[in-house]
């Protein structure tokens, strides 16, 4: 028996690449990989799914111009801008906004603790009264 040669392409569909938008298959593969990752994490597809795999859907979305992407100098500038964003500072700013919520949580805990203490005192009072009356009856 002869083995059939298997194609190791990303998909088995023929791809017509517009060289004015995407200059190489390598660039197409990078963009498709990023989009496939988004799709696998639950992003909604922008076209009707013709394939079963997220890579096929991603490629079809890109080739049908349903996905916005940047390349070249514009991509370099965007990457530099992202690198300048201080993630730690953003997280600290979010944490500063959280103490307001934690103050409310503290107040709620104090209220609930006070309520539980009052209920326990009433319970102890009535159980103590019952035990005293049962001792007197004996």
Curated annotation (Swiss-Prot):
Residues passing through the membrane, by range: none
Keyword Transferase part of the UniProt annotation: yes
Keywords for the protein's UniProt record, in alphabetical order: DNA-directed RNA polymerase, Nucleotidyltransferase, Transcription, Transferase
Family matches, as Gene3D superfamilies: 3.90.940.10
E.C. designation(s): 2.7.7.6
Any Pfam family matching the protein: RNA_pol_Rpb6
Coiled coil: none
One Gene Ontology term of the molecular function aspect: DNA binding
Disulfide cross-links: none
Recorded GO CC terms: DNA-directed RNA polymerase complex
Cell membrane as UniProt keyword: no
Top-level EC class: transferase
InterPro entries reported in the protein's UniProt record: DNA-dir_RNA_pol_omega, Pol_omega/Rpo6/RPB6, RPB6/omega-like_sf
GO biological process: DNA-templated transcription
Reaction equation(s) it catalyzes: RNA(n) + a ribonucleoside 5'-triphosphate = RNA(n+1) + diphosphate
HAMAP family: RNApol_bact_RpoZ (MF_00366)
Subunit structure, interactors included: The RNAP catalytic core consists of 2 alpha, 1 beta, 1 beta' and 1 omega subunit. When a sigma factor is associated with the core the holoenzyme is formed, which can initiate transcription.
Functional note: Promotes RNA polymerase assembly. Latches the N- and C-terminal regions of the beta' subunit thereby facilitating its interaction with the beta and alpha subunits.
Family classification: Belongs to the RNA polymerase subunit omega family.
Name of this protein: DNA-directed RNA polymerase subunit omega
Natural source organism: Thermodesulfovibrio yellowstonii (strain ATCC 51303 / DSM 11347 / YP87)
Gene: rpoZ
